[in-house]
Amino acid sequence: DASATVCDPACGSGSLLIRAIDAAPFPIMGYGQEKESTTAGLAKMNAVLHRKAEIIIKSGNTFSNPQYMDKSDNSVLERFDYIVANPPFSMKNWRDGIAGKEYGRFEGYGDMPPEKNGDYAWLMHILKTLKSNGKAAVILPHGVLFRGNAEATIRETIIKKHWIKGIISLPANLFYGTGIAACVLVIDKEGAANRQGIFMIDASRGYVKDGNKNRLRERDIYRIITTFNEQITTDPKYARFI
């Protein structure tokens, strides 16, 4: 489908967006937004080097200055078929300048994400900008699965909507700049009506040490993808429905 779209609302230098487009079995238009203008410039260069004329990168704060608006109504955010994101973990000042620029992103969840932690704010932005049959994958700190207070209220609301297809727990110390364990939330709005549970994979033990970081081997990645795609539950310690 030549009109399919994928967005990364925290695109950094654009590598995740480029890989998503490379992995798509059909032509797809890419849209990225990056807060730092220098990094946004790098993303544009990266797109050119990878011969990706179909990628648009815009600079600006995704919360206070979202760049992609509905073409027919400038007061509504544009929605995408697919979203991929590895946003900055536990962002402290995400609320700066958002007054009057919420665009309904934080409504209907029973609470607002905490002022000093933007993890759920990213998730709400993604859910708002995903089409009603859209699919997304977002990397967030493991804490989003169990932290309390406002986040617990929001989490409960999201779970009740059956938008989350699966959660993949990753090893700690995988990403540069943080030792925090992360997880991938796989969102699929299309199948929500008939979804009974969430497919959980605990991939936190499948890795190899690489200097002072941990790294997923090809076989670890293959196991995650195969288990997820085929919904294999033969080893309940590794994967099961909850």
Label every model-predicted segment.
Residues 71-242:
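A conserved structural/catalytic subdomain of Rossmann-like adenosyl-cofactor enzymes
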Residues 18-25, 45-48, 128:
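Short, well-ordered alpha-helices that flank and scaffold nucleotide-derived cofactor binding pockets
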Residues 19, 42-45, 68-71, 94-98:
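Short acidic, glycine/serine/threonine-rich loops at helix termini
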Residues 4-11, 31, 57-59, 199-201:
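Beta-strand segments within the central parallel beta-sheet cores of soluble alpha/beta enzyme folds
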